């Protein structure tokens, strides 16, 4: 989400050319200059879809579209993603994660429009149809770590509120949660622990990734406490492309497919990504065309691998606008995990009958979810990580060793402080929602060990 | 770490890589792909040393490809000829002129600087195999280092080349083919190779190819160097990711076959080299470059670059020849 918010228009978005010549390059440069001047992707040619004479907008793939068709194109992708992956059922309440950036702003707008349309259908059918899904909005307030003046932050958050309340049919609720609340319900204690934990992380990239983990934890907490069935993120193709490369660079090739699918049910509350096929440039442009208000003053400056990857991809995009889609498509060909689809019994009962066979086929193929997930980031463990975990379990002396072994190699390297004392202190600061799970496993583990020891003692007695 | 200890650690790491991956067996005849550059020169030197020290019992040869680039390849081949004498390894040189009837100088005259790397990469790969067959060797080793492999992982993600992505981290490729290729430097950093060559005062040629003067500075290579500065282990992390990628079983992979004209391995009816050569000989050098209309199915195994618009290709061009797996 942060990556998506940080994206910006990068000049001309012409589709790829099969060949180039000097004159074509000159025309291209002129078009690029003109596009840069108006600050948007635009070319003066007819809409490729309806033939209208309005100023056309170029989308990846080279097709020029007028404003209306461009918008319909993006909305169509959103709706297709939602329906063909059964992301939202009529009985669901959906929590939309809103950061203030263009991508989540578009997601907010589109899910709102889908809901309005569903309500109209429901009204017309005299309540005989299925109920309409609910929508709530969540904003994670990370201002405690922000170096900007307090009043500026307050104004920005007020903007966030007004954007949400400005939607014609009110959303169910607006939830603004402070990031430190995942540490403790007491404000000062939570803040202290958050600051202390973040300060212990020496690696810039590690700090960023740690905050990303906390953000997801915060969203999960909001959703669980308020009865939401789904969490919808505004992650777009551009942000996902950045994530694909970042994860590759961090050695997370095994787990990366988990993060790039439409559906992710490894969390308590399933997470869905309906904007996965849309580019940040397109979403930013749509916000401009539709005068959708965004709020990006809360974005934090970024150092480290994630921002290096983002600038690399930005550079590639300038040369070939389809590059981001290519990266996402490559990742799509990697094997997803069993939790990358809905598999609970009866989940697809609400689907129109023509769609049900597709999902039922998957249901019958379903295997048990057996992945071990990283304590912090939720990444599935690779074989070498599993081996490390198994060997640690056998010889673990302290709880700290189990905690450490339940972190993936990437988190171990870039987040955990070096040194055992520091490590112990770091884990003592972490949210109970994370370490509590470990404590439960640890307790059952030691219980099992006690039983084994009793058995050995009995065996010994018999021997005597 | 002092110089002597660096030598020991460097050589032992490569030895461990060779042993753990069972790259060779006693009696193997091994051709070292030798370009005269630092990677292949260090590889020839280290392999020769380890062969003596650890008694691999290998017959080692130097195998060079002469692309026919005036002012560049002829000078680098002089370096390899000196290596032949210094290391006592027999040298075989095979040229594009002999194999294809065209030198790179001729090819560049025909098509210009753009795209000439496609020809060179495809031709060199096949030339290396043909030279190895002439020497009757069991294995080919190349000097691809960790930086090269990490770069290839990234490039294959950027290009959407899932077939290559699934195998570009293999330390041995072509095991089911006539002559497997090995990369003993898979886990060795480029800067360590440079340092080793420098301290050992090894004789190597370091000028970049004159027909792709900016190839070394491709976006991907630049990105990897930035990464390495920020987090040195990123290169090995990329390789580890590449090793851990699991390709979805629903993804269709190209089928292996042979070229009906020259018998070389290919997933198409004609291998890429024959397609390119046919274009050259018919005065249509652009044939086989860029988007191919009417050709269905996966890429040819010989194809160096994915079919992409010309404009985007230059930025993704890696170091000369080294992205060709």
From Swiss-Prot, chain A:
UniProt entry tagged with the keyword tRNA processing: yes
The keyword tRNA processing belongs to this UniProt entry's keyword annotation: yes
Pathway given in the UniProt record: tRNA modification; 5-methoxycarbonylmethyl-2-thiouridine-tRNA biosynthesis
GO CC, any one term: cytosol
Recorded GO MF terms: nucleotidyltransferase activity; sulfurtransferase activity; tRNA binding
Annotated compartments: Cytoplasm
Intrachain disulfide bonds: none
InterPro entries: CTU2, Rossmann-like_a/b/a_fold
Entry's Gene Ontology BP terms: protein urmylation; tRNA wobble position uridine thiolation
SUPFAM superfamilies referenced in this protein's UniProt entry, alphabetically: Adenine nucleotide alpha hydrolases-like
Major location (coarse): cytoplasm
Superkingdom as given in the UniProt entry: Eukaryota
Keyword annotations: Cytoplasm, tRNA processing
Function, as annotated: Plays a central role in 2-thiolation of mcm(5)S(2)U at tRNA wobble positions of tRNA(Lys), tRNA(Glu) and tRNA(Gln). May act by forming a heterodimer with NCS6/CTU1 that ligates sulfur from thiocarboxylated URM1 onto the uridine of tRNAs at wobble position.
Family designation: Belongs to the CTU2/NCS2 family.
HAMAP family to which the protein is assigned, alphabetical: CTU2
Designated name of the protein: Cytoplasmic tRNA 2-thiolation protein 2
Provenance organism: Oryza sativa subsp. japonica (Rice)
């Amino acid at each position: 989400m942060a990556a998506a918010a940080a994206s910006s228009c990068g000049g001309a978005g012409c589709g790829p050319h099969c060949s180039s010549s000097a004159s074509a390059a000159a025309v291209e440069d002129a078009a690029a200059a003109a596009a840069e001047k108006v600050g948007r992707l635009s070319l003066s040619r007819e809409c490729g879809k309806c033939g209208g004479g309005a100023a056309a907008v170029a989308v990846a793939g080279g097709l020029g579209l007028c404003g209306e068709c461009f918008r319909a194109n993006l909305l169509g992708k959103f709706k297709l993603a939602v329906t063909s992956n059964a992301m939202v059922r009529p009985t669901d309440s959906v929590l939309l994660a809103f950061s203030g950036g263009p991508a989540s702003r578009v997601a907010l707008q589109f899910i709102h429009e889908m809901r309005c349309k569903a309500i109209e259908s429901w009204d017309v059918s005299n309540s005989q149809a299925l109920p309409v899904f609910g929508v709530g909005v969540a904003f994670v307030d990370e201002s405690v770590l922000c170096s900007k003046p307090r009043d500026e932050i307050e104004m920005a958050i007020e903007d966030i509120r007004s954007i949400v309340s400005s939607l014609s049919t009110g959303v169910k609720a607006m939830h603004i949660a402070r990031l430190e609340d995942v540490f403790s319900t007491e404000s000062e204690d939570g803040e202290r622990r958050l600051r202390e934990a973040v300060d212990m992380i020496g690696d810039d990239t590690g700090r960023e990734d740690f905050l990303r983990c906390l953000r997801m934890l915060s969203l999960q907490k909001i959703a669980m406490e308020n009865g939401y069935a789904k969490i919808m993120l505004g992650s777009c193709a551009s942000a996902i492309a950045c994530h694909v490369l970042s994860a590759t660079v961090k050695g997370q090739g095994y787990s990366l497919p988990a993060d790039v699918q439409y559906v992710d049910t490894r969390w308590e509350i399933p997470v869905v990504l309906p904007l996965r096929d849309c580019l940040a440039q397109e979403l930013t442009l749509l916000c401009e065309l539709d005068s959708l208000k965004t709020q990006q003053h809360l974005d934090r400056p970024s150092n480290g691998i994630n921002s290096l990857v983002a600038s690399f991809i930005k550079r590639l995009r300038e040369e070939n606008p389809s590059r981001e889609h290519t990266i996402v498509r490559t990742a799509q060909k990697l094997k997803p995990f069993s939790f990358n689809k809905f598999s609970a019994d009866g989940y697809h009962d609400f689907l129109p009958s023509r769609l049900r066979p597709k999902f039922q086929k998957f249901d019958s193929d379903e295997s048990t979810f057996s992945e071990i997930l990283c304590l912090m980031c939720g990444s599935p463990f690779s074989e070498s990580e599993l081996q490390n975990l198994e060997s640690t379990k056998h010889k673990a002396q302290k709880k700290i060793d189990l905690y450490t072994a339940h972190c993936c190699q990437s988190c171990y390297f870039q987040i955990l402080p070096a040194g055992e004392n520091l490590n112990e202190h770091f884990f003592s600061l972490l949210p109970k929602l994370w370490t509590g799970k470990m404590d439960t496993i640890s307790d059952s583990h030691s219980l099992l060990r006690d039983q084994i020891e009793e058995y050995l003692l009995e065996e010994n007695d018999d021997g005597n | 770490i002092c110089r002597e200890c660096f030598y020991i650690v460097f050589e032992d790491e490569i030895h461990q890589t060779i042993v753990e991956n069972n790259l060779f067996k006693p009696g193997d005849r091994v051709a070292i792909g030798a370009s005269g550059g630092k990677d292949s020169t260090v590889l020839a030197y280290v392999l020769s040393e380890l062969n003596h020290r650890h008694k691999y019992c290998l017959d080692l040869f130097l195998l060079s490809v002469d692309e026919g680039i005036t002012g560049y390849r002829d000078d680098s081949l002089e370096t390899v000829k000196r290596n032949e004498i210094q290391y006592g390894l027999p040298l075989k040189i095979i040229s594009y002129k002999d194999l294809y009837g065209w030198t790179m100088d001729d090819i560049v005259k025909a098509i210009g600087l753009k795209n000439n790397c496609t020809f060179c990469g495809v031709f060199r790969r096949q030339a290396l195999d043909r030279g190895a067959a002439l020497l009757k060797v069991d294995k080919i080793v190349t000097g691809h280092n960790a930086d090269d492999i990490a770069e290839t992982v990234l490039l294959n993600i950027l290009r959407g080349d899932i077939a290559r992505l699934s195998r570009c981290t293999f330390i041995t490729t072509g095991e089911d083919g006539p002559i497997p290729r090995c990369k003993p430097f898979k886990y060795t950093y480029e800067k360590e190779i440079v340092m080793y060559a420098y301290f050992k005062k090894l004789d190597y040629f370091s000028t970049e190819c004159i027909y792709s003067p900016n190839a070394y500075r491709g976006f991907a290579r630049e990105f990897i160097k930035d990464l390495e500065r920020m987090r040195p282990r990123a290169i090995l992390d990329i390789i580890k990711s590449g090793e851990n990628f699991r390709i979805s079983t629903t993804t269709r992979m190209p089928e292996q076959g042979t070229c009906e004209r020259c018998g070389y391995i290919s997933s198409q009816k004609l291998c890429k080299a024959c397609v390119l050569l046919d274009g050259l000989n018919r005065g249509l050098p652009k044939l086989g470059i860029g988007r191919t209309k009417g050709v269905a199915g996966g890429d040819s195994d010989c194809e160096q670059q994915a079919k992409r618009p010309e404009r985007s290709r230059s930025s993704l061009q890696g170091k000369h020849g080294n992205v060709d797996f």
